[in-house]
Design a protein with these regions (language model features):
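Class I S-adenosyl-L-methionine-dependent methyltransferase catalytic core
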Residues: 1-274
């Protein structure tokens, strides 16, 4: 988000991370059960960051690893990886995903620890201190952008929408259940713990996007930048992950369900009966 960067600002660039849509990126590479996670990172985003900032054999950490997207992409690229996941269900699935990647020929090694990333020194082995080349992670987004949706037809009525796979467990300690201020305070603690694990010159890469809550914009990228600064990190770059495909000089849109639904409704208002 260039607007939230201090002047003159770090390096800005655009990454083409949606040359394939998300389903194709995950098909076969990830276990079918992984689709149930409410907030999965796009594999190409993780792979691009890992390729950009690390070399084969180096160590990558994701302190909020979910189903292990960062870990899977890292070991496919010949890096080693460590992940921390708060919920046992997803930690087990991340470990299974690592085993699946190894069966597919991934050459790196990875390990998942189940625990609270706000307490990284208590969760991870001490020998990892100052060994991590890259931290890549993402804080929980608003519930409005979690999960998947399905259109449903009702007899004698217009179609409806059902949302599913959009919730974590009910454990109140999960940051996903906290308000924005509490979530960012917890995320700052996580970043502070990550800083102690970085090798000299190591990088922390955080993916974030804004969303709307009750009609108001929540500028998560700017809030994340502030959290990084509080954790003692120095902004180095801002990479925009393009969520559309590129074909020469043409852009291939990859709209969400709700974007398409909004377009359909707008067209009906302009041309009733179409």
């Amino acid at each position: 988000c260039p607007a939230c960067l201090p002047s003159p600002g770090p390096l800005l660039s655009v990454w083409a991370t949606a040359q394939q849509d998300s389903r194709i990126q995950r098909r076969g590479r990830y276990l079918p059960a992984s689709t149930a996670h409410p907030a999965k990172m796009l594999p190409a985003i993780a792979a691009t960051a890992i390729t950009h900032y690390t070399q084969p054999g180096e160590l990558v950490l994701d302190p909020m690893c979910g189903i292990g997207t960062t870990l899977v992409e890292a070991i496919h690229l010949g890096r080693d990886a460590v992940g921390v996941e708060f919920e046992e269900r997803w930690a087990h699935l991340a470990a299974a995903g690592i085993a699946h990647a190894r069966r597919q020929g991934a050459t790196g090694s990875a390990e998942v620890f189940c625990g609270d990333a706000r307490q990284l020194p208590a969760v991870l082995p001490a020998h990892l201190a100052r060994r991590v080349a890259l931290v890549i992670t993402s804080p929980p987004y608003g519930p409005s952008v979690h999960g998947q949706v399905r259109a449903e037809q009702r007899s004698g009525q217009g179609g409806g929408v059902r949302k599913y796979d959009n919730r974590y467990s009910r454990d109140p300690a999960n940051l996903a259940h906290h308000g924005l201020d509490d979530m960012l305070a917890g995320f700052t603690r996580i970043l502070t713990g990550c800083r102690a694990l970085l090798r000299p010159g190591g990088i922390v890469a955080v993916t974030a996007r804004p969303w709307r809550q009750h009609g108001e914009l929540v500028d998560l990228p700017a809030a994340v930048l502030a959290a990084e600064t509080r954790a003692g990190l120095i902004p180095a770059a801002c990479h925009v992950a393009l969520l559309a495909g590129l074909r020469g000089d043409h852009r291939v849109a990859r709209p969400s369900f709700f974007q398409l639904d909004n377009i359909r409704k707008a067209r009906r208002r302009v041309s009733p009966g179409t």
